[in-house]
A protein has these predicted regions:
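N-terminal leader/targeting and pre-domain segments
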Residues: 1-253
Length: 253
């Protein structure tokens, strides 16, 4: 019978994986004799048996959903997970949600050329090396209290549901070139240390920036003249916009 894992791997303390030499299960063992791509192999086995909760797991080799069959309406949970290698989803059509609460991505988070038809949540997390969500369709993207210590690319991506970024720190460039937002876009309590590119962005409902500081060059500069976009306490290209909706609000009153 397999031993109980000494680390909590998912929503249960009973780990069905055998205990390894150092007393930990194979996924947490970090010795030189650790098999290559063990994290991906275990992920593959778990998905085949309908297990989608990968919380508290440690990946030394990264993670990819390549060639894995995911059931419809699956909830992919990666809470408190750590990825030393890149996390990659490429060219996939998935009716699945992803929860990256309290996760760390040391070598990048990549979801490209994909259609994700349920919600993606990134909360209390850290992303380094690269963040690339380009050339994709997402149902909704909710990100809260997260440090993005790298370039962030959302170019040529369509968000069909809500897009909410709150309390986010961008250490490098931010790219939304040619992005499409079919529902509300909310960008609050944000610092962008370098350049931001919002050229050719299309939005269908509300687009709101509040308590945002763009320290680098912002494109297009003409955004400050568009009163259909809400700007409240926003620093853009060295100019502070306290409230570009004030005239409209005064008329209503």
């Amino acid at each position: 019978m397999p031993q109980i894992c000494k680390q909590k791997i998912s929503n249960t303390q009973n780990c069905d994986r055998e205990e390894y030499k150092d007393g930990f299960c194979i996924i947490h063992h970090n010795g030189k004799d650790k098999p290559n791509n063990i994290f991906r192999k275990i992920i593959r086995d778990d998905i085949y048996r309908g297990f989608y909760n990968f919380s508290y797991m440690i990946s030394y080799d990264g993670f990819s959903l390549e060639e894995l069959k995911i059931e419809k309406d699956a909830e992919m949970i990666f809470r408190n997970s750590n990825f030393a290698g890149p996390f990659q989803i490429k060219n996939r059509d998935l009716t699945a949600s992803f929860d990256f609460t309290d996760a760390n991505f040391d070598s990048g988070l990549f979801i490209t050329l994909s259609d994700i038809k349920k919600e993606i949540i990134i909360k209390n997390s850290n992303i380094s090396m690269d963040l690339n969500f380009s050339l994709s369709n997402f149902d909704s993207l909710i990100t809260y209290n997260t440090k993005i210590n790298c370039k962030a690319n959302f170019s040529n991506t369509c968000i069909n549901g809500k897009f909410e970024f709150n309390h986010i720190y961008f250490k490098d460039n931010l790219n939304f070139l040619n992005a499409v937002f079919r529902d509300d876009f909310t960008f609050q309590n944000i610092i962008v240390e370098k350049d931001a590119d919002f050229r050719n962005v299309v939005f269908f409902k509300k687009m709101k920036f509040e308590n945002v500081e763009f320290k680098g060059n912002f494109k297009p500069a003409e955004i400050i003249d568009n009163d259909k976009i809400e700007l409240k306490n926003v620093l853009i290209n060295g100019k502070l916009i306290e409230n570009n909706q004030k005239a409209k609000e005064d008329k209503k009153n």
